[in-house]
Amino acid sequence: MPLLDSFTVDHTRMEAPAVRVAKTMHTPSGDAITVFDLRFCVPNKEVMPEKGIHTLEHLFAGFMRDHLNGNGVEIIDISPMGCRTGFYMSLIGTPEETRVADAWKAAMADVLKVKEQNQIPELNVYQCGTYHMHSLEEAQEIARHILDRDVRVNSNEELALPKETLKELHI
């Protein structure tokens, strides 16, 4: 099985909250696609609650588009990580990490402005696979966590696992 890019970085040295360019690739027509690791929690030390991350998934996708789309950038998808420590965001374009961090903070401020659970987009049996598994309160706690700690940039060079370590792990 091929080694995925996300497993070539040392999760024990990752800071959070932080932005990291996880991957950059080009389509056959030459468009740049960038995948960002938006790390909300320190790996193996913190985790987002399932209802909160699910609600955040519904809110974050729209709010990030409001603040980041334009000037050569268009978000394709924002999806939560299975480990519940962050989200992956795929987009067309190559925005600077600081631009992504600013949009992320603005999106978190927007999450805090949502007043009631019924304002969560697509919160119904037709558009959500687990529509009863939501918590606006938990999503807002996550947003406060980000805004209270600010957003840094994680560098791939600083986080790269040495080849010897990968060999020891039989990868």
Curated annotation (Swiss-Prot):
Cofactor binding description: Binds 1 Fe cation per subunit.
Record's catalysed reaction(s): S-(5-deoxy-D-ribos-5-yl)-L-homocysteine = (S)-4,5-dihydroxypentane-2,3-dione + L-homocysteine
EC number: 4.4.1.21
Positions bound to Fe cation: 54, 58, 128
One Gene Ontology molecular-function label: S-ribosylhomocysteine lyase activity
InterPro entries, sorted: LuxS_sf, Metalloenz_LuxS/M16, S-ribosylhomocysteinase
Keywords: Autoinducer synthesis, Iron, Lyase, Metal-binding, Quorum sensing
Co-factor requirement: Fe cation
One Gene Ontology term from the biological process aspect of the record: quorum sensing
Family per similarity comment: Belongs to the LuxS family.
Quaternary structure and partners: Homodimer.
Protein name: S-ribosylhomocysteine lyase
Organism: Enterobacter sp. (strain 638)
Originating gene: luxS
